[in-house]
């Protein structure tokens, strides 16, 4: 009995020691890293629906040579979606969360991203990329470039129409404030200073368009204004000339009336003088006849 008790005690001690050692080994082997977090929309969806488990499928960043080789092979039954972007372009950085959402929503499509500096210009010319960001869907028979609006719902419709695949889930990227993704912004929500700070290229593009329109229409407006002023001045000069001519005619008419009056006065004076002269002649003739008669009578007496 004593031997059995000793054996049992030793076995119990060994078991406790082994458990403690195992526990210490596990603590030593525990990694000191944080688990990788998925995109913000996946975390938001998991917080809303804890029962749904969606593994994020981020796109693969490749160089230009690798994507050219992959697209040249075009494996049978494989569909590729390629995002061409530029690190300096603010639209590209804002579009990345949407492309990550598409990669998770369509895991049956291989998603790749190509940065501008990692590819030759001939690659962009080959696939018709003239601006960033640009999306290209490629399968074994077709190659389609997306030209529509770059919102999630439009891109999902484009994927479904081009590939025939349906998304495994629908995400809403536009309202994720914590991840810094797209949000619908109305013009009244942001001031001009904030727009210039957040999107300077948009402001520069708008200013360029305004200057272009002004450079086109300002000379036309100035020429029409000059023509209007010239016609207006000519009409004004004609009016002034007509008015002055009328005044001159009136002045001449007044002068003519004065001359006529003076002529009438002169004619009246000459008429009076003539009458006086004729009266004087008659009076003189009568006086001479009377004097002659008196002299003859005195002689007869």
From Swiss-Prot:
Magnesium listed as a keyword: no
Domain Thioredoxin: 51-164
Compartment list: Membrane
The keyword Nucleotidyltransferase appears for this protein: no
Major location category of this protein: membrane
Any matching Pfam family: Thioredoxin
Signal peptide positions (record): 1-21
One cellular-component annotation, GO: membrane
Membrane-spanning segments: 201-221
Protein known as: 5'-adenylylsulfate reductase-like 5
């Amino acid at each position: 009995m004593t031997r059995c008790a000793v054996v049992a005690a030793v076995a119990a001690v060994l078991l406790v020691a082994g458990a403690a050692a195992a526990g210490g080994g596990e603590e030593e082997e525990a990694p000191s890293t944080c688990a990788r977090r998925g995109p913000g929309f996946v975390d938001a969806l998991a917080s809303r629906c804890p029962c749904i488990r969606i593994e994020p499928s981020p796109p693969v960043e490749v160089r230009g040579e690798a994507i050219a080789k992959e697209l040249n092979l075009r494996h049978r039954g494989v569909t590729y979606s390629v995002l061409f972007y530029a690190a300096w372009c603010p639209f590209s950085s804002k579009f990345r969360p949407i492309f990550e959402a598409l990669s998770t929503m369509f895991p049956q499509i291989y998603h790749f991203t190509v940065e501008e500096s990692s590819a030759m210009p001939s690659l962009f010319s080959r696939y018709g990329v003239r601006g960033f960001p640009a999306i290209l869907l490629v399968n074994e028979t077709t190659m389609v470039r997306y030209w529509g609006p770059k919102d999630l719902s439009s891109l999902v419709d484009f994927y479904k129409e081009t590939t025939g695949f349906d998304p495994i889930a629908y995400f809403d990227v536009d309202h994720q404030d914590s991840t810094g993704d797209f949000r619908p912004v109305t013009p009244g929500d942001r001031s001009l200073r904030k727009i210039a700070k957040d999107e300077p290229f948009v402001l520069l593009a708008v200013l360029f368009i305004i200057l272009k329109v002004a450079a086109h229409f300002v000379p036309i407006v100035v020429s029409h204004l000059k023509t209007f002023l010239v016609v207006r001045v000519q009409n004004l000069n004609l009016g002034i000339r007509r008015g002055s001519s009328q005044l001159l005619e009136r002045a001449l008419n007044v002068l003519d009336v004065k001359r006529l009056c003076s002529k009438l006065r002169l004619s009246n004076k000459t008429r009076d003088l003539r009458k006086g002269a004729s009266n004087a002649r008659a009076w003189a003739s009568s006086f001479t006849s009377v004097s002659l008669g008196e002299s003859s009578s005195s002689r007869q007496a």
